[in-house]
């Protein structure tokens, strides 16, 4: 499959890295020669220097009817124009367009019928994730599956957790009426597929599946539950900061800080119950005057990673109970000290997940990357009768020939969810959620979801 990536920024480079390691013929376009040279040195791909929306550039990059175009530059307008030209002039197979401005997302028909096949709005996705994390304190990552009926949750085990230093199967006796399944644990950065006799240890990174209503009680098994939050301070009144404030202000006490006077005036008009303050998140006197020591959750959501990191450090030093930040450079994620930054959310990871979902072979409603560097992800797909699935029907799940590092975490059949289902026999058209840990043959999993 031919993939043409437009834009070699963080998202484009991450896509190039991920897709070039799979069975794709990847080309990438950017105006920055140095970025393209680095990518060409590191990965098996082709590069083209030029403007992403220029017809000659697209032609030189190989755009044709077999090409899928991923327009992920930092300019919505460039992405839109690129998709229009790629479709109308080169009749490309599919266009996927990254759009930051929700106004564009709501007006796709204005750009011509069929010019943009799939539009993705990472800012909306980031906001939804932030809301989930604020509503479920203690969880470090929450992803939705099965149309929202199941959540995959990451939580770090602490020594005060009820299940720590006990066997995993003890969760059933602790919570007999709660249905959950733990498909993966990361211990000291390395993945393991647990069983009932696995001892939960402090600092284990545990992934579990459960209904949203059960998340908080399961988190409490792994760590002492954080106290409920009512006071939230947001640094950055951009698209994400303002959307988060708007989504939470009816249920929480919100303060939002932005250095731009004009932006503050806009926020004051758009928000009803949020206190809007002009200033910087790194202004110690401002934070003290706004009683930072009483803030339950401090969210640094500007477009500048360093500002977000330093603001979170300062807020924690001054007494904020919990810090959540946005980090655009994913390499920062693994080096941030947890005593200052509780949760770092990566728009880059979310965008790559959204794109991969639409590139997946077969019938795949959802695909989520949990860890970009280690390759951990989960795929929700519908298993069909085809030449690859002959050995997968009329056999217990425990006997299926899955690649190493893969586990079927749940089966959804006629709106019924089955977990702990080692003896369940798969049927055609079952929806399954597969966790893939580390480097494994992902194509073998995707082949299960092919329709013929």
Pin down the residues of each PLM region.
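Cytosolic regulatory regions of ion transport systems
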Residues: 1-452
């Amino acid at each position: 499959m031919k993939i043409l990536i437009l834009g070699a920024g963080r998202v484009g480079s991450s896509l190039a890295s991920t897709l070039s390691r799979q069975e794709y013929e990847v080309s990438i376009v950017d105006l920055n020669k140095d970025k393209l040279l680095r990518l060409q040195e590191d990965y098996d791909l082709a590069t083209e220097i030029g403007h992403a929306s220029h017809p000659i550039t697209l032609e030189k990059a190989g755009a044709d009817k077999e090409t899928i175009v991923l327009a992920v530059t930092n300019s919505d307008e460039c992405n839109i124009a690129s998709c229009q030209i790629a479709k109308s002039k080169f009749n490309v197979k599919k266009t996927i367009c990254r759009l930051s401005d929700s106004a564009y997302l709501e007006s796709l028909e204005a750009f011509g019928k069929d010019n943009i096949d799939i539009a993705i709005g990472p800012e909306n996705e980031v906001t939804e994730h932030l809301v989930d994390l604020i509503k479920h304190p203690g969880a470090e990552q929450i992803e939705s599956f099965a149309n929202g009926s199941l959540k995959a949750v990451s939580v770090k085990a602490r020594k005060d957790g009820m299940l720590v230093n006990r066997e995993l199967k003890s969760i059933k006796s602790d919570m007999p009426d709660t249905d959950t399944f733990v498909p993966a644990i990361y211990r000291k950065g390395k993945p393991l597929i647990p069983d009932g006799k696995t001892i939960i240890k402090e600092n284990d990174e545990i992934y579990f599946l459960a209904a949203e209503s059960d998340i908080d009680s399961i988190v409490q098994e792994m760590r002492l539950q954080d106290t409920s939050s009512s006071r939230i301070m947001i640094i950055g009144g951009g698209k994400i900061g303002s959307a988060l404030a708007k989504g939470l202000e009816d249920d929480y006490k919100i303060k939002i800080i932005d250095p731009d006077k004009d932006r503050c005036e806009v926020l004051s008009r758009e928000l009803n119950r949020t206190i809007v303050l002009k200033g910087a998140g790194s202004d110690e006197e401002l934070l003290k005057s706004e009683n930072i020591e009483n803030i339950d959750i401090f969210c640094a959501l500007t477009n500048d990673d360093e500002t977000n990191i330093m603001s979170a450090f300062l807020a924690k030093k001054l007494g904020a109970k919990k810090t959540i930040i946005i980090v655009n450079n994913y390499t920062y994620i693994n080096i941030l000290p947890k005593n200052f930054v509780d949760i770092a959310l990566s728009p880059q990871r979310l965008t790559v997940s959204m794109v991969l979902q639409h590139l997946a072979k077969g019938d795949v409603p959802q695909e989520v990357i949990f860890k970009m560097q280690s390759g951990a992800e989960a795929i929700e797909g519908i298993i069909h009768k085809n030449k690859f699935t002959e050995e997968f029907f009329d056999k217990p799940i425990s006997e299926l020939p899955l690649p190493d590092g893969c586990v079927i975490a749940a089966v959804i059949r006629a709106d019924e969810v089955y977990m702990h289902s080692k003896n369940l026999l798969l049927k055609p058209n079952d929806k399954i959620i597969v966790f893939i840990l580390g480097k494994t043959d992902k194509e073998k999993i995707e082949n299960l979801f092919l329709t013929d």
